[in-house]
Regions:
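A short, compositionally biased domain-edge/stem linker segment
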Residues: 33-44, 291-301
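Cleft-lining beta-strand/loop regions that shape enzyme active-site pockets
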Residues: 50-171, 300-424
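C-terminal long alpha-helix characteristic of the crotonase
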Residues: 230-231, 262-308, 415, 470-476, ...
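Intrinsic disorder and flexible/low-complexity segments
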Residues: 304-309, 313-343, 461, 533-588
């Protein structure tokens, strides 16, 4: 009897603890949802003679990001600036009589070159309305400075710094490390320039990869330097001389003498500049409106029109399943659902991806073809910083493809990469294997080197994937297979060159794609935008994914900018290891 009561009390205690924990979790979820809702519904008023303040810090994202429960609970919420909201706010501010000008507060933005170019172009259009832009920084990163050159005047702290250095790329190579630990990487590929596998095979860049990097980095820098020169009223030779001069070491007086900046002043002194520019009383403070607050005001007023354009965001690595990036098991149903929505008049796929799983890329491509054939509605692609390899695969069938001049695209090639750990097991830790099989046709595994027959079969598998990739591109672009092969071979192209060789139709951002589609729909000033995937907070999904997200977050936080290499290595060795992705590089 005593044992019975002990067991019963233990069970009751377990029930009460479970109830308490679920109740606590529910309270936390309600708090998170309430805080999120409150932040979304924060409204501000815009007085006359106001200044739109754009703070270049944190991270620029293509769109507003979904709620991350771990960030909400810990308070670790990095500042994010959705590019689409920023551009819409700048365009509206150009016609808003209450906004006199823009103040760029530069504090080290994290963004891709295509994002920065799109933002800068929006600022240039703002100036064309006759309004002014001023920029200030204690320290200008090169990205900050590129955007700031759209301003009428560039100010800097008297003991500040400006870093203009051109572009360089850095790649880590692991061949010697893998040799030391006894891991061999077995690679089968198609494409002379398909360099994504090189970090596992070589200790330095191949001649072909060096050649392609020099080409696209040079073209991208020429575009950036040209815009900087245009903004500062100098020639590109002057900008290149700045990039060769270690500008970070120059005194601000020298920066002004070289016309890199206009004036030196402390931050508080910019208040007087802005008060004078907005014609306020001398003892007034400038009337600042933060761009995110301003964008929130616009979002409450927009989405009215007879036509609806769907913008579907495809961002990250392409895989078959998972919680992050572009997964075919989530994106394919989304595309097919859009094909059935009668209130959607056109689709723009916004791609920011260096590729991934070839199988998943094909499934997404096919779903988009279904959208076209079932609806007959216009379908465009807008490329972000990168839409290469698998990112180009899912893009190639669009009616029109848009890219920024500095977008990285192309990389039409395929590879398979399978690690062989038998030396690690045998020689390093003394583990041996023995395999008994009924037949020879096994897929290569991690525990043994590929046999000649397996390698031949893998090469045939990769060749077939490459031929299909090329065929998809040729059909989508309306050209011959041979013409695609001439520019394929895994080569990465900058957007400007891609437009010249037929991989891209128009140079411009998402705003241009929207304007062109609206014109095609005869709805230039009468359309609304619906964004997908839906970002509504689903707390049950967050709870279910919390454990896996935490594990991935810890590993990838430690790896930092090299986390993508970890993800690629993790995917290899599976049957879906046929990859169409470009190399991971860090561009400085």
């Amino acid at each position: 009897m005593k044992q019975f009561f002990v067991s019963m009390l233990g069970a009751l205690a377990g029930i009460w603890i479970s109830v308490f924990l679920f109740g606590l979790l529910g309270i936390i979820m309600i708090g998170v949802m309430a805080a999120t809702s409150a932040s979304d519904n924060t409204m501000v008023t815009v007085d006359s003679n106001s200044v739109l303040r754009i703070t270049l810090s944190g991270e620029i994202t293509d769109r507003k990001q979904p709620v991350n429960i771990m960030n909400e609970l810990t308070g670790d919420k990095p500042k994010q600036y959705p590019l689409n909201m920023m551009i819409a706010a700048i365009e509206h501010a150009a016609e808003d009589d209450d906004i006199d000008g823009i103040f760029l507060d530069c504090a080290g933005i994290s963004a891709g070159m295509a994002q920065l170019q799109a933002l800068r172009q929006a600022l240039v259009r703002f100036k064309e309305s006759g309004k002014w832009i001023y920029a200030y920084a204690d320290t200008y990163s090169q990205g900050d400075y590129f955007v700031a050159t759209a301003a009428d005047s560039i100010f800097i702290n008297p003991i500040g710094m400006a870093d203009i250095h051109g572009l360089s790329s850095t790649t880590l190579y692991f061949k010697d490390m893998l040799d030391k630990i006894g891991v061999d990487v077995q690679v089968v590929k198609v494409g002379t320039y398909k360099s994504a596998v090189e970090p596992f095979m070589l200790n330095q860049s191949s001649e072909a990869n060096t050649r392609q990097q020099q080409a696209y980095l040079g073209n991208i820098w020429n575009e950036i330097a040209g815009k900087i020169a245009e903004g500062r009223g100098v020639d590109t030779a002057a900008v290149n001389s700045w990039a060769d001069s270690f500008t970070f070491s120059l005194e601000t007086s020298e920066l002004a003498a070289r016309h890199i900046v206009d004036r030196t002043m402390y931050r508080h002194e910019t208040d007087k500049i802005l008060v004078d520019a907005t014609r306020l009383e001398e003892d007034d403070d400038p009337r600042m409106v933060d761009i995110l607050d301003y964008a929130t005001i616009l979002s409450s007023k927009k989405n009215h029109g007879d036509k609806t354009i769907a913008v579907l965001y495809a961002v990250g690595d392409i895989t078959e399943s998972g919680n992050d990036g572009i997964t075919s098991d989530r994106l394919v149903p989304q595309i097919l659902d859009l094909a059935e929505e009668s209130d959607i008049d056109g689709l723009i796929l916004r791609v920011n991806s260096g590729g991934g799983c070839a199988y998943a890329s094909e499934q997404i491509w096919e779903a988009l073809e279904q959208f076209k054939s079932l609806t007959g509605k216009p379908y465009y692609v807008s490329m972000g910083d990168v839409a290469a390899s698998g990112g180009y695969y899912i893009s190639c069938g669009a009616d029109r493809i848009y890219a920024e001049p500095v977008t990285l695209t192309g990389s039409i090639g395929i590879f398979g990469l399978i690690p062989d750990a038998h030396r690690l097991l045998n020689d390093k830790i003394g583990v041996h294997t023995s395999t008994v099989a009924t037949n020879r046709g096994q897929f290569p595994g991690l525990l043994n080197a590929m046999t000649p027959d397996q390698r031949n079969a893998m090469q045939s598998y990769v060749d077939r994937g490459y031929e299909l990739f090329v065929k998809r591109c040729a059909e989508g672009r309306g050209v011959s297979v041979d013409s695609i092969k001439a520019i394929a071979e895994g080569r990465v192209w900058d957007g400007l060159t891609a437009s010249r060789i037929g991989l891209v139709d128009r140079l411009g951002g998402l705003d241009m794609a929207l304007a062109d589609m609206a014109a095609e729909l005869d709805a230039a000033d009468n359309y609304k935008i619906k964004e997908y995937p839906d970002l509504k907070f689903k707390w049950w999904e967050e709870v279910l994914n919390m454990s896996s997200n935490m594990k991935a977050s810890v590993v990838e936080t430690e790896l930092g900018q090299y986390a993508p290499l970890y993800r690629m290595a993790r995917e290899c060795g599976h049957l879906s290891a046929l990859q169409c992705r470009m190399e991971y590089i860090t561009i400085h």
